[in-house]
């Protein structure tokens, strides 16, 4: 194990002293992504021009990706619209590497979703792999053991020539890294839409478990405490990734950005996880920060800024893979599998012993000071002398102009049912087969089969169930459920309501599993903030999500904003991905999405309206217009209470939410989950809700779920729904003998035919 710096190349170093005497020196601030007003502000803060190293730090830390400079004025709502009741389970909120939630019995869970969109388009395998690695290190840095990951994904049109390249690379990268770490992949989404052509969305969620006393924070306190960098060596990969890739739009005329994509090593990260957990268990580190976006620039400035003093480090002590790296490149490098920690002098020997045990390289960089300054030297000469808060926290804040798009009124007036493509299909059975074989509704087993969903042995549920479920405590069965959801079409039609709908579906998915929703993380994927119409979409979505979280009583614990998701002037649909975490007293009581027992009654909970605008069926007919389904969060809460209580008390044997694809999709998915058919009647539903059989099947009305109820529990279940005043209707029974889905008077489809159609689509395009 090497603990001393590698051979360094000699450079003409731009020192602080030199910067003070050479104000005329030209610097590449624009090439590093800074605006002219931002460069002027840096000069004002420092009272001189920045050194090359300081410029590198400010450029990455003031990037859109790191500073949230265009979004933070809106994101403040997540902290403002929080009641005391919502804070009850919150141990660590927005501002740290990940939120932490109390789940009872002294256990806590930390979870977060982030994006790695732009790198995954440039270099699909490594971009996706390091997206998993980065979010897992966020979880480690909170003091937790990672226990699962999820991956909400969006690609362009399934038949576009470039989609196969992206799908193969991204799915392989996620599976290759996550499987090597030994982390189950318990859920996510796979959506295909031409609006994501050239801008795939690769969002990654990780969850970890820890005891309350094990929580760790990112701060550097205690004058004289040592600062150490450990893990992989620093190389040239990922230099400027935060500013070059994640903070500007793509332009095909610009040179290749492959060098800005990080390269990951999951086996090095696996060792790093165990190494960190041993450090935490022995209380050897006082503060810790993972190195992700902006690398050492971020770690040093955030640790110092969050602490009580300052920091002084020697950059030549950094272990390098490439000795030709300049100081600025070392500061900006986003090489993976690295951590920075603060260690008391008394714990130095213990720290080194743990490093030796795990054969992890490390280098002592410096110490915590009382100066309030972040000072970085290169071979004894100062190249950075800044107030760390100006780098990490007090960057520019833009209240960018925004306005409602002029075209939106016409779009919202163009309802599907009033359009010329809304003809009711003559053969409803064929329509169901068409729906379930469409790219978005087809089985995603081609993807999920490449992931290990059950490694570690604590997975109680995973895709295709509504939520992923993980056991936390083997003795009591205490566990958590997670679901991620978003619908870009809904948000395009109405960003505020679309964001509410994303939360409502994720909340509902957690409840159908039987867990009680507790907290939220979000990844807000949008186009350029410099476009006032995109900024309006963003502002509306954030307001809608914040309001919905308040109404449902679930706080946002943290997340990510990904802007500039557009090629040229074409932006993606606004896509706020929402992750909801819920808790089980015992995961053994979790409810799967498919029925299993012959003769059980099948009930539909909720009201169905003629709501097909933005639906999957409308999408298949090439239509996008109108208003998304009405969201009634009060009804969502009532539905969740019914589902949670019914699951806990053994009143339901299966539960599946209704969302994309409506009742048709839910019936097929519940039947195919365990290969058990059903006999269904829709006439009473059509009469009760004043809709046609076609609308009953394909409407995407919200606050609905399908459940199967044992005959012995029907009276109790009906009484509960009636007492709560919630709409419920017996549609039919589970039929284990027929091997078919029989919707009486409409169609009968064998499960073999449905399964063949459902599972053939992705292999057809991707092999």
UniProtKB/Swiss-Prot annotation:
Location, primary (coarse class): cytoplasm
EC number: 6.3.5.3
Binding site for Mg(2+) 1: 114, 560
Pathway(s) where this gene product acts: Purine metabolism; IMP biosynthesis via de novo pathway; 5-amino-1-(5-phospho-D-ribosyl)imidazole from N(2)-formyl-N(1)-(5-phospho-D-ribosyl)glycinamide: step 1/2
CDD domains found in the cross-reference section: PurL_repeat1, PurL_repeat2
Active-site feature positions: 65, 116
Gene3D superfamilies: PurM-like C-terminal domain (3.90.650.10), PurM-like, N-terminal domain (3.30.1330.10)
UniProt binding sites for Mg(2+) 2: 138, 290
Sequence intervals crossing the membrane: none
InterPro entries listed in its UniProt record: PRibForGlyAmidine_synth_PurL (IPR010074), PurL_linker (IPR041609), PurM-like_C_dom (IPR010918), PurM-like_C_sf (IPR036676), PurM-like_N (IPR016188), PurM-like_N_sf (IPR036921)
Binding site for substrate: 115-118, 137, 262, 334-336, 562
Localization (cell): Cytoplasm
Top-level division of the source organism's lineage: Bacteria
GO CC terms, sorted: cytoplasm
Reactions the enzyme catalyzes: N(2)-formyl-N(1)-(5-phospho-beta-D-ribosyl)glycinamide + L-glutamine + ATP + H2O = 2-formamido-N(1)-(5-O-phospho-beta-D-ribosyl)acetamidine + L-glutamate + ADP + phosphate + H(+)
Binding site for ATP: 68, 112, 522, 559
GO terms (BP aspect): 'de novo' IMP biosynthetic process
Keywords per UniProt: ATP-binding, Cytoplasm, Ligase, Magnesium, Metal-binding, Nucleotide-binding, Purine biosynthesis
Pfam family, one: FGAR-AT_linker
Gene Ontology MF terms: ATP binding; magnesium ion binding; phosphoribosylformylglycinamidine synthase activity
Subunit relationships: Monomer. Part of the FGAM synthase complex composed of 1 PurL, 1 PurQ and 2 PurS subunits.
Entry's family note: Belongs to the FGAMS family.
PANTHER family given in the database record: PHOSPHORIBOSYLFORMYLGLYCINAMIDINE SYNTHASE SUBUNIT PURL (PTHR43555:SF1)
Function field: Part of the phosphoribosylformylglycinamidine synthase complex involved in the purines biosynthetic pathway. Catalyzes the ATP-dependent conversion of formylglycinamide ribonucleotide (FGAR) and glutamine to yield formylglycinamidine ribonucleotide (FGAM) and glutamate. The FGAM synthase complex is composed of three subunits. PurQ produces an ammonia molecule by converting glutamine to glutamate. PurL transfers the ammonia molecule to FGAR to form FGAM in an ATP-dependent manner.
The name this protein goes by in its record: Phosphoribosylformylglycinamidine synthase subunit PurL
Organism, as annotated: Renibacterium salmoninarum (strain ATCC 33209 / DSM 20767 / JCM 11484 / NBRC 15589 / NCIMB 2235)
């Amino acid at each position: 194990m090497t603990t001393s710096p590698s051979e360094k190349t000699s450079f003409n170093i731009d020192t602080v002293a030199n910067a003070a005497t050479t104000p005329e020196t030209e610097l590449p601030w624009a090439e590093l992504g800074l605006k002219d007003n931002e460069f002027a502000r840096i000069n004002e803060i420092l009272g001189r021009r920045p050194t090359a190293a300081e410029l590198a730090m400010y450029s990455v830390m003031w990037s859109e990706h790191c500073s949230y400079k265009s979004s933070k004025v809106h994101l403040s709502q997540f902290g403002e619209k929080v009641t005391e009741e919502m804070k009850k389970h919150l141990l660590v909120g927005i501002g740290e590497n990940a939120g932490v939630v109390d789940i009872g019995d002294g256990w806590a869970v930390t979870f977060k979703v982030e994006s790695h969109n732009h790198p995954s388009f440039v270099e699909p395998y490594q971009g996706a792999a390091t997206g998993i690695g980065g979010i897992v290190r966020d979880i480690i840095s909170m003091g937790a053991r990672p226990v699962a990951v999820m991956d909400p994904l969006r690609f362009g049109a399934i038949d576009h020539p470039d989609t196969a390249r992206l799908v193969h690379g991204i799915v392989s990268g996620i599976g290759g890294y996550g499987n090597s770490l030994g982390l189950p992949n318990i859920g996510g989404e796979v959506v295909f839409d031409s609006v994501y052509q050239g801008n795939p969305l690769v969002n990654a969620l990780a969850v970890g478990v820890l005891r309350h006393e094990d929580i760790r924070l990112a701060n550097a306190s205690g004058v004289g405490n040592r600062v150490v960098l450990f893990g992989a060596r620093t190389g040239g990969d990922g230099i400027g990734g935060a500013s070059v890739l994640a903070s500007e739009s793509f332009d095909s005329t610009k040179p290749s950005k492959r060098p800005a994509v990080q390269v990951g090593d999951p086996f090095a990260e696996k060792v790093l996880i165990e190494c960190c957990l041993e450090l935490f268990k022995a209380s050897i580190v006082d503060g810790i920060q993972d190195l992700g976006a902006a690398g050492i620039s971020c770690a040093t400035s955030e640790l110092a800024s969050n602490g009580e003093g300052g920091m002084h480090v020697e950059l030549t002590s950094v272990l390098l893979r490439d000795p030709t790296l300049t100081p600025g490149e070392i500061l900006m490098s986003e090489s993976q599998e690295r951590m920075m920690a603060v260690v008391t002098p008394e714990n130095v020997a213990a720290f080194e012993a743990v490093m030796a045990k795990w054969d992890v390289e490390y280098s002592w960089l410096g110490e915590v000071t009382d100066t309030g300054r972040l000072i970085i030297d290169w071979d004894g000469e100062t190249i950075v002398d800044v107030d760390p808060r100006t780098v990490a926290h007090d960057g520019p804040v833009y209240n960018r102009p925004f306005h409602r798009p002029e075209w939106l009124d016409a779009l919202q007036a163009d309802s599907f049912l009033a359009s010329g493509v809304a003809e009711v299909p003559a053969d409803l059975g064929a329509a169901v087969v068409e729906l379930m074989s469409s790219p978005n509704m087809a089985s995603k087993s081609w993807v999920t089969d490449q992931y290990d969903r059950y490694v570690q042995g604590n997975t109680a549920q995973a895709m295709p169930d509504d939520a992923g479920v993980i056991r936390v405590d083997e003795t009591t069965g205490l566990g958590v459920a997670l679901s991620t959801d978003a619908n870009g079409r809904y948000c395009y039609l109405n960003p505020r309501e679309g964001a509410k709908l994303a939360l409502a579906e994720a909340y509902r998915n957690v409840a159908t599993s039987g867990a009680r929703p507790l907290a939220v993380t979000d990844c807000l994927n949008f186009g350029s903030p410099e476009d006032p119409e995109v900024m309006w979409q963003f502002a509306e979505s954030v307001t809608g999500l914040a309001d919905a979280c308040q109404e449902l009583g679930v706080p946002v614990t943290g997340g990510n904003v990904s802007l500039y998701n557009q090629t040229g002037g074409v932006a993606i649909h606004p896509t706020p991905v929402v992750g909801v975490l819920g808790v089980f007293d015992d995961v053994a009581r979790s409810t799967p999405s498919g029925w299993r027992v012959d003769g059980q009654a099948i009930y539909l909970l909720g009201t169905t309206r003629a709501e097909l605008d933005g639906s999957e069926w409308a999408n298949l007919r090439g239509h996008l217009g109108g208003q998304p389904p009405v969201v009634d969060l009060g009804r969502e809460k009532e539905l969740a209470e019914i589902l949670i209580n019914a699951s806990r008390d053994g009143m339901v044997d299966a539960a599946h939410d209704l969302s994309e694809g409506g009742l048709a999709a839910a019936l097929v998915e519940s039947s195919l989950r365990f290969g058990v058919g059903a006999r269904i009647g829709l006439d009473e539903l059509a009469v009760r809700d004043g809709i046609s059989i076609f609308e009953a099947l394909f409407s995407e009305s919200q606050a609905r779920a399908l459940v199967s109820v044992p005959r012995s529990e029907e009276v109790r279940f009906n009484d509960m729904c009636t007492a709560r005043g919630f709409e419920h209707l017996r549609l039919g029974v589970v039929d284990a003998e027929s091997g078919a889905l029989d919707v009486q008077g409409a169609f009968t489809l064998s499960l073999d035919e449905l399964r063949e159609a459902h599972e053939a689509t992705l292999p057809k395009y991707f092999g």
